């Protein structure tokens, strides 16, 4: 089985690696969902193209096993949803929540991500 990074890369999504990219996303838009928090920012014109996504879970989520399980679920949800609903030129950071990210049914996790992306990209009144 290929590593998770290459799974995201095959769908045209690259993974955020630098701390500065995560910090820039943290200062931009954010939208809470039942099982995760989604941060999003539109990149400047000179930056990389395409959709980029990062995943994080704090120690509040649990031990390393629980955090990695939550991130695997977020990674798979992003792989399924972002190619259709994500926008090129945007960075997304998916943050796992304690107990909800790992225990929520996967269909609910997908719905949470879709709803958060719709709200993030909705025109402001």
Curated annotation (Swiss-Prot):
GO cellular component: ribonuclease P complex
Listed GO MF terms: 3'-tRNA processing endoribonuclease activity; ribonuclease P activity; tRNA binding
Pfam families (UniProt xref): Ribonuclease_P (PF00825)
Top-level class of the enzyme under EC nomenclature: hydrolase
Catalytic activities: Endonucleolytic cleavage of RNA, removing 5'-extranucleotides from tRNA precursor
Classification via SUPFAM superfamilies: Ribosomal protein S5 domain 2-like
Domain of life according to the entry: Bacteria
Keyword terms, alphabetized: Endonuclease, Hydrolase, Nuclease, RNA-binding, tRNA processing
One of the GO biological process terms: tRNA 5'-leader removal
Enzyme Commission number(s): 3.1.26.5
Coiled coil stretches, renumbered: none
Function: RNaseP catalyzes the removal of the 5'-leader sequence from pre-tRNA to produce the mature 5'-terminus. It can also cleave other RNA substrates such as 4.5S RNA. The protein component plays an auxiliary but essential role in vivo by binding to the 5'-leader sequence and broadening the substrate specificity of the ribozyme.
HAMAP family named among the record's database cross-references: RNase_P
Subunit structure: Consists of a catalytic RNA component (M1 or rnpB) and a protein subunit.
Protein family per UniProt: Belongs to the RnpA family.
Official protein name in the record: Ribonuclease P protein component
Native source species: Ruegeria pomeroyi (strain ATCC 700808 / DSM 15171 / DSS-3)
């Amino acid at each position: 089985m290929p590593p998770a990074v290459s799974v995201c890369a095959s769908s045209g999504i690259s993974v955020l690696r630098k701390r500065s990219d995560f910090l820039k996303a943290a200062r931009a838009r954010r939208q809470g969902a039942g099982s995760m928090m989604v941060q999003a920012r539109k990149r400047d014109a000179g930056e990389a193209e395409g959709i980029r996504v990062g995943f994080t879970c704090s120690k509040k989520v649990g031990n390393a096993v629980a955090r990695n399980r939550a991130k695997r679920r977020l990674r798979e949800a992003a792989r399924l949803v972002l190619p259709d609903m994500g926008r090129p030129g945007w960075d997304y950071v998916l943050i796992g929540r304690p107990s909800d990210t790992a225990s929520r049914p996967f269909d609910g996790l997908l719905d949470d991500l879709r709803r958060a992306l719709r709200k993030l990209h909705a025109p402001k009144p």
